[in-house]
């Protein structure tokens, strides 16, 4: 028989599975957004990325004197476990949900907070000691943490894609050498045209993919500009001075990617141009 614990928010009390690392906000989202059946935990790159974002935020808040030593260690450890994939099964919010990612952000905040509580010897849901909002989500908003997470996830997935394309290029090169002396007819306008080697055809495939890799990498670099520290609408309300720059630096150190703070956070917060441009590279590669 499933056991439950009671958690509360501004709406009221709600039963949450006792062994769940998520909390009341996630439980409400699970009940409210039964749309696709595909959960955010089905995207390990996203979960890993949000773990990095929350870890960078915790380090930044600690450096600026907002997060005490007693919370930095357990929150950091919880974030690292999220990054390692230990809690993918706890990210149960539907991939399509209202609020521009608020439910997913809270899913992460609650999982990290409850794991931190556990590490400190407290019961899950005892948010007086470690709060999903006041501590894990400190100096953040869904509107900067969520898009930064998506950008990092795409960067990681782009690297994986490029690795696979490089393997395909290597295979094409090998075939190019293998069939270097095999003559075939080249075709134009659906008709035989002039002779070529089968090896030349495979070499052309390889060259084409090399161009696609260059375009993918160039376009993915646009995701390195983030709006952490902009909070809700880019004005930086509730984030301390210096937070944006330091958070980007911390995220860069953690991931090895050269993240920088956007020049204008108000503009950057709603901007989706980088996704459009990167999508064009994916479409070109597919064609």
Locations of regions flagged by a protein language model:
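Conserved, well-structured ligand/cofactor-binding cores
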Residues: 1-287
């Amino acid at each position: 028989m499933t056991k439950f614990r009671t958690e509360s928010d501004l709406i009221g009390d709600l039963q949450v599975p006792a062994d769940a690392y998520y909390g009341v906000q996630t439980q409400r989202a699970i009940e409210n957004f039964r749309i696709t059946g595909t959960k955010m935990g089905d995207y390990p790159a996203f979960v890993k990325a949000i773990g990095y974002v929350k870890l960078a935020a915790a380090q930044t808040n600690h450096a600026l004197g907002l997060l005490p030593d007693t919370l930095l260690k357990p929150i950091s450890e919880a974030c690292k476990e999220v990054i390692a994939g230990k809690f993918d099964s706890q990210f149960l919010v539907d991939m399509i949900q209202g609020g521009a990612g608020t439910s997913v952000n809270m899913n992460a905040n609650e999982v990290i907070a409850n794991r931190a509580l556990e590490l400190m010897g407290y019961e899950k849901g005892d948010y007086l000691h470690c709060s999903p909002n006041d501590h894990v989500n400190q100096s953040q908003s869904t509107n900067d943490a969520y898009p930064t997470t998506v950008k990092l996830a795409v960067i990681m997935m782009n690297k994986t894609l490029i690795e696979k394309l490089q393997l395909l290029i290597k295979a094409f090169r090998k075939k190019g050498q293998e069939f270097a002396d095999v003559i075939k007819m080249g075709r134009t306008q659906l008709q035989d045209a002039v002779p070529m080697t089968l090896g030349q055809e495979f070499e052309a495939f390889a060259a084409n993919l090399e161009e696609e890799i260059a375009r993918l990498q160039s376009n993915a670099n646009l995701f390195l500009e983030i709006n952490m520290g902009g909070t809700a609408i880019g004005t930086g309300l509730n984030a301390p001075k210096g937070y944006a720059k330091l958070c980007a630096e911390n995220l860069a150190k953690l991931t090895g990617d050269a993240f920088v703070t956007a020049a204008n956070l108000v503009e950057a917060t709603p901007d989706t141009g980088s996704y459009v441009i990167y999508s064009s590279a994916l479409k070109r590669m597919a064609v």
